[in-house]
């Protein structure tokens, strides 16, 4: 098992306290991995700064070629990555192998192509005797903080656009889930020039703060909680660093009475519970028009009850565990408080699964009201709420009455209605008659407390650049 930091092209052991890493499916410890110490954080940032002097000047073709090599290496090691991610996160192995690892490789391939298409505005004479042009240049040293729910995928979302734009990166994976990132470090050491990517490890409260607050870091990119985002913004405010924040979500799923109910049920069964609901875009906050409310509640309850919970190594397993015991207890707390409300009905689930591991039953809670905690707060587990609504105006108001603004979906056969709602919903993405679908070519990111900046797409690449005006007198 790889457990080495990557600093200046060398794989080295951390000099700090060892942190225990667990298998969520069993609750057993699988590794004890030393953190970086503060000297190693400093060395990683300085290595990135030194490498940037050359990497920032390389041609797009050169960067693209190396990104394609990374994609090839990920595909060649797909089974290893899938086994490690499944072991460390409790994800079903087949889902990681067939869904997530190919998507990771595709992100690197997309940004390899995008690197060769990045350009500024056309030159022109806007002042007599002077020619102006726009450059898009790399930011410099980027400190990237990845979350625990999709460790490898989020590492790719952080690394690929930053490298494509010509930046150097110091990446810190979540302390709970470092295994695939360490394996990636082992591969990157043989592909990239020394210092272009550095990978460190440790708790956010000390190692994360040292990294994001380092004076030589030009930009911080985070995928994480609102609390972590707010902390980093406060911590780095004095240095006015550039920041990219992808934070929490509480996706409204709006089901009209003309929707294809079978399609709705199949979709929510998948998109509300993938990765045990530990996804910022999970289809978790259902608003169902009153005429079909009872039908949807009954059908969805029956469908969700068939989700198979089990060993991540079993090809028939659909739902794995939550990431840690504290996360399980957090989800249980949300559900218990909801169950205590007289108007809420547990349609299915609602309990911890007996036995080992951090499993929670897939849960459907009907009768929820707009102001209920279960409707307003991000649970980040296999739990969905269902609320009835009367008309468009009411449901648009309810959907937008949220601190979150990441993802949403509308289910209807009326294309005019779909366009109206898509124009009104205050979310970074609105799907129609589907949910959860992401592609490398399209941007992902939120608004309000869900953050700002875009992952993937050309917009994601541009986020890691600085726009500069060059004016030449002649």
Swiss-Prot record:
The keyword NAD applies. Pathway: Amine and polyamine degradation; putrescine degradation; 4-aminobutanoate from 4-aminobutanal: step 1/1; Amino-acid degradation. GO terms for molecular function: aminobutyraldehyde dehydrogenase (NAD+) activity; NAD binding. SUPFAM superfamilies: ALDH-like. It catalyses: 4-aminobutanal + NAD(+) + H2O = 4-aminobutanoate + NADH + 2 H(+); 5-aminopentanal + NAD(+) + H2O = 5-aminopentanoate + NADH + 2 H(+). Gene3D superfamilies: Aldehyde Dehydrogenase, Chain A, domain 1, Aldehyde Dehydrogenase, Chain A, domain 2. InterPro entries: Ald_DH/histidinol_DH, Ald_DH_C, Ald_DH_CS_GLU, Ald_DH_N, Aldehyde_DH_dom, Aminobutyraldehyde_DH, PatD. It comes from the Bacteria. The active site is at residues 246, 280. Belongs to the aldehyde dehydrogenase family. Gamma-aminobutyraldehyde dehydrogenase subfamily. This is Gamma-aminobutyraldehyde dehydrogenase. It comes from Pectobacterium atrosepticum (strain SCRI 1043 / ATCC BAA-672) (Erwinia carotovora subsp. atroseptica). The lineage of its organism: Bacteria, Pseudomonadati, Pseudomonadota, Gammaproteobacteria, Enterobacterales.
């Amino acid at each position: 098992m790889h457990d080495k930091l990557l600093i200046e092209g060398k794989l080295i052991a951390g000099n700090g306290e060892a942190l225990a890493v667990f298998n969520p499916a069993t609750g057993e410890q699988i590794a004890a991995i030393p953190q970086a110490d503060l000297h190693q954080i400093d060395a990683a940032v300085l290595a990135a700064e030194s490498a940037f002097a050359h990497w920032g000047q390389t041609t797009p073709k050169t960067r693209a070629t190396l990104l394609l090599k990374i994609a090839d290496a990920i595909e060649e090691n797909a089974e290893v990555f899938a086994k490690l991610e499944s072991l460390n996160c409790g994800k079903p192995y087949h889902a990681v192998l067939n869904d997530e690892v190919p998507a990771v490789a595709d992100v690197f391939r997309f940004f390899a192509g995008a690197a060769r298409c990045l350009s500024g505005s056309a030159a022109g004479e806007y002042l007599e005797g002077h020619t102006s042009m726009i450059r898009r240049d790399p930011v410099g040293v980027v400190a990237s903080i990845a979350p625990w729910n999709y460790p490898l995928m989020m590492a790719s979302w952080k690394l690929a656009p930053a490298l494509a734009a010509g930046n150097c990166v110091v990446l810190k994976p979540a302390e709970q889930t470092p295994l695939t990132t360490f394996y990636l470090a082992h591969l990157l050491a043989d592909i990239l020039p020394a210092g272009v990517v550095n990978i460190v490890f440790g708790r956010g409260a000390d190692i994360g703060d040292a990294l994001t607050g380092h004076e030589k870091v030009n930009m911080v990119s985070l995928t994480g909680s609102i609390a972590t985002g707010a902390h980093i913004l406060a911590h780095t405010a004095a240095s006015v660093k550039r920041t990219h924040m992808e934070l929490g979500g509480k996706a409204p799923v709006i089901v009209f009475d003309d929707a294809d109910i079978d399609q709705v049920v199949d979709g929510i069964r998948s998109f509300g519970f993938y990765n045990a609901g530990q996804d910022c875009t999970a289809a978790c906050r259902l608003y169902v028009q009153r005429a079909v409310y009872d039908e949807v509640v009954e059908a969805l309850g029956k469908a969700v009850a068939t989700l198979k919970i089990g060993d991540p190594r079993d090809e028939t397993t659909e739902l794995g565990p939550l990431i840690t015991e504290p996360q399980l207890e957090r989800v249980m707390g949300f559900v218990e408080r909801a169950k205590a409300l007289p108007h809420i009905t547990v349609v299915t689930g609602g309990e911890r699964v007996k036995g080992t591991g951090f499993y929670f039953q897939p849960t459907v809670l009907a009768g929820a009201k707009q102001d209920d905690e279960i409707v307003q707060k991000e649970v980040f587990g296999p739990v969905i709420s269902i609320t009835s609504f009367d008309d468009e105006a009411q449901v648009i108001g309810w959907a937008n009455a949220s601190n979150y603004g990441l993802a949403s979906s509308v289910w209807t056969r009326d294309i005019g209605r779909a366009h109206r709602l898509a124009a009104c919903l205050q979310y970074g993405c609105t799907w129609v008659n589907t949910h959860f679908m992401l592609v490398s070519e399209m941007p992902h990111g939120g608004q309000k407390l869900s953050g700002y900046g875009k992952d993937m797409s050309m917009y994601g690449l541009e986020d890691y650049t600085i726009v500069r005006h060059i004016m030449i007198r002649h």
